[in-house]
């Protein structure tokens, strides 16, 4: 069987996806996502995500490539590093990152995530 190209810019079947209420710091952000592709290992997936304005805590166990296509966001680490992004910007959030996401205006992004399996020790 031959693998097929997967378009990320077509019609979207959005699913509600958080954030968890105990992580929200400001506003009432509503997230929706559409996973367009997942690999057979379940470690890599990509698609589109959207959020209404708000601020919430994050703790990444995965590596995520983000490409903002609409809106403005600010991401701040617990160490105080602050980066702002708008439509057309691309960035990576590495596994182990802890901090906050703030969405200033309705945001849409493409994402590609790699989340390695946990290795069990013998």
Spans of model-derived segments:
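A short, N-terminal "cap"/entry segment at the start of jelly-roll beta-barrel domains
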Residues: 1-43
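Conserved short histidine dyad/triad with adjacent acidic residue
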Residues: 42-60, 94-95
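Short hydrophobic/aromatic-rich beta-strand segments that constitute the beta-sheet cores
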Residues: 58, 75, 109-111
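Short acidic-glycine-tyrosine-enriched beta hairpin
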Residues: 79-95
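Ligand-binding loop in jelly-roll beta-barrel domains
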Residues: 87, 95-119
């Amino acid at each position: 069987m031959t693998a097929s190209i997967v378009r990320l810019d077509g019609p979207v079947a959005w699913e509600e996806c958080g954030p968890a209420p105990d992580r929200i710091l400001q506003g009432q952000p509503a997230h929706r996502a559409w996973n367009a592709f997942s690999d057979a290992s379940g470690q890599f997936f990509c698609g589109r995500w959207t959020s209404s304005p708000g601020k919430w805590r994050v703790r990444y166990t995965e590596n995520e490539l983000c490409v903002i296509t609409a809106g403005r966001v600010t991401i701040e680490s617990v160490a105080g590093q602050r980066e702002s992004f708008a439509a057309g910007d691309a960035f990576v959030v590495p596994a182990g990152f802890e901090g906050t996401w703030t969405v200033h205006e309705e945001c849409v992004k493409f994402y590609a995530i790699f989340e390695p399996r946990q290795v069990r020790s013998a």
